Structure formats: structure tokens, C-alpha cells
Amino acid sequence: MNMTPHRKLWPAMGALLFLVPALVGIAFADDQQGGTHHQRNKSPETLYIWAGDQARLAPDFLAVIDFDESSPSYGRVVKTVPVPPPGNVSNEPHHCHLSADKNILACGGLLSLLRGQNGIFFFDVSHPRDPRFLFAANGSKSSITDDFLPLEKGGFLVTQMGSSTGMTPGRVAEFNVNLRMIAEWPSRPPEMGFNPHGISARPELNLMLTSDFMMPASSLNIVPGDPELRGSIRVWDFNRRKIIRTISIPDAIGTMDVKLIPGDPKGRAFTAGMFDGLVYLVDPERGTAEVVFDCEDIVPHIEVPVRGGMVQLLAMPQSGERLLFASFQAGQVGMLDVSNPKHPVQTGIVSLGVDAGPHAIKLTDDDKRLVVTDYFLNEDDFGKIHFEGDHKVHVIKVFKDHLERDPRFELDFNTAFPTGPARPHGIEMK
């Protein structure tokens, strides 16, 4: 069964990118922070893809890929780093992110809870081509690990979409520089609809946003009814780790991601409704979200069951003048000119095919390449979500006025590994 645009707010049923340096006249995209200015703008040479075995038999693993454009082995797998036992199979590898100093890679297991396993995995990547698994951790009040926000002095904030039982409320877990969990925020979470998925921050404004997506357990067959999708943005006092405002977007069915606009003096952000196909401009100060673009108007238009093509994850370059997105059902990766945030204009599109299933996207630090993975989530015989994709990894070259697929980079996770087809999801590079 596919997810449907049905939403109810159930009560709880069961027991940072990185900090933006306050530099005068310069603001970097929240998902481009970390390291020195030179590191941020250097073209990466190593690509990491966090993936799982499609058969759910072999260990989850980190694929290390040659990402050096000058290399004759560009696009080839260098090695894999399997997660060691216990708890190393069928975690449903999801998102991952480097620490601010780029020496630690944190990865999430979306469905680790179903097997009683730890769901947050840490790798030492100080030697880029030879990562070393460190350990796995877990929340005490939360689960269903999603996105990571690296902290400037080390550590991470981590969106945990569900409670300890996969229900509501979720939390934002905090890990310190020693990678020890020190808190699960907020101390008094909202009881209704708090299931954080996306996360974005501008510490120089003392501002953080999270986006609520879905009550996780509602996607399982054992829970009657359709998946309970959310449509809301939480505005946080970043320093106090406290929610100060909720922006409800009733028609935005499934607010999977949110991105603050780098350098925007009003601290505005973009989000999109996965099932309504609309892009919203969020004003945290005013507590508003207005429709500024309809993905039904993307050219070429691909007719699919979900309105707007099923827009999922977002990315923004350091300039804050472009918004990139992946449309899972339409099989497209697009770019909008958002130099006027209230009037986005399409400036680029790459069509991968309706069966491709692009989901996760990640810009290189120099904003010149976009990595795309074709897989969202398939709960197989135990759940209602079946969005498989074709398991390919793509590189798209990003120009100011267009997007262009890199024909040299061809990587198919169906055939790349001796253990059999794998599901690629999380993306990072160094």
C-alpha cells in the first residue's frame, strides 16, 4: 500500500548541519558548513554512500567511492565498510552527515527500533579512503533516526522522528564532542504531531527549524489505517534548544524537509509538501508559510499519481539564490531561481525517468556538483510504504542557469557489490 494524503493528530501512545560562523557579509548554506573556508570550497575527492542490503541479510555498510574528477577510476567503489555485529543488519540506512571538522561521519538507521538495535552509527573518516567504524548509540526517549545537524564545536543534533516506541512525540537528540548523548530536546515536547524529520539552523540568528513529517509507527501494517502525515514547521530558540513557535501548514501533506535561506536578513526558509506538490516560503518571525511555487508547473511535466511529482528532499547553495529538489515519482531533479524568494522561477531540470526514484540529494562544498541517490524507503512485507527506486547514484553538474547530468559517473547499487542488490540512501563527501 502506498502512502496516502490522510492525516490525524494522535496523542502519544508509548512509554546540525553545522553551526554557521558569524562572519560579516558572508553566510553559508546550513548544509554546507564545517571545516575551514578552504575546506568548504574545495572540490571533494571521496564520496560516501550509506546503504543497506535489499534482502536484509547482509550487514549495512558504508560505500567509499572515488569522487576525484581527475582520477581514471572516478565513480568506482574503492571499498566498503560493513557495520560489525551486533545489530548490524536491516537498520534501514537513512541519512548521514560529517562533523564540523569533517573527521566523524554520523549515520542513521531509520528502522533499527524494529529489531531492538541501536540506530545511530559513528565512523572515523580522518583517513578519507579508509573509514573506521567506531560504535553505535541510541536515544532513551526517542527513535527513528533521520537527519543530522553538525555543531560547530563538535557533536551533532539529530532528528528522531518517533518516541522510544516509534510513536509521538519525537525528539532532537544532542551528542557532544565526545559523541555521547547529553540530551533529547525539547525537555517538554509537544504531545501532538511532533515528529521531526528535516532540520536547519542559523546560529548567528539563534534560529533553528525542524519539519514534522509522519508518525512513524503509522506506516507499519500492525497499526490500522493510513500513514499519519504531518504538515508543520517548529521554530526553535537555538541556544536554549526550545520550541518557541509552531507554524501549521494544513495543506502541506508531509513536510519532509526545511532549508533556511543563507544570508536572508528575515531568517526565512523553504519547505515543500510531499503530497500537495507546493513549495512554501516560511517566515519564522511572522509565523507564516505562503505558497510560492507549484511543482505541477515544472517543465517538462511528468504525469504521475502524486501531485507535483512527490517532492522530497531539498538543498541550497551557499549563495542562497537557488533551491534544488528531488521529485521521487516524477523521476526529476530540479532547480529554482529563488533570488526573489517570493517568486521562484525554474532554471534547471534533469529527468532520470519515472522509475528512477531520486530522493536524497547533496551539494558538494563548492556547489558545483549534486549527488543523487535513487531510493526512499521500502518496508517490504511489514509496512505500507513501498518507494524503491532503481538504486542508482547520479552526479549532476550545477550551473547558475541549468543542470547537467555527469555522463562519466555511473554507479548502480544493484550490481556493484558481491552481496547482491543494495539500497543507497545517505550521502556525504570529503
Regions found by a protein language model. Give the residues of each.
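Loop/turn-rich, solvent-exposed surfaces of beta-rich toroidal or solenoidal domains
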Residues: 305-386, 393
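Beta-propeller fold detector
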Residues: 73-83, 132-138, 182-188, 244-248, ...
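Beta-propeller domains
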Residues: 99, 191-195, 199-336
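Beta-propeller blade signature
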Residues: 63-67, 118-126, 169-179, 225-240, ...
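Asp-box/WD-like beta-propeller blade repeats and closely related beta-sheet repeat scaffolds
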Residues: 118-204, 212-214, 218
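Blade-loop segments of beta-propeller domains
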Residues: 74-150
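Short, conserved, GDST-rich strand-edge loop motifs in beta-rich repeat architectures
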Residues: 41-42, 49-56, 107-117, 159-169, ...
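Beta-rich, blade/repeat-based domains predominating
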Residues: 34-38, 84-100, 140-154, 190-205, ...
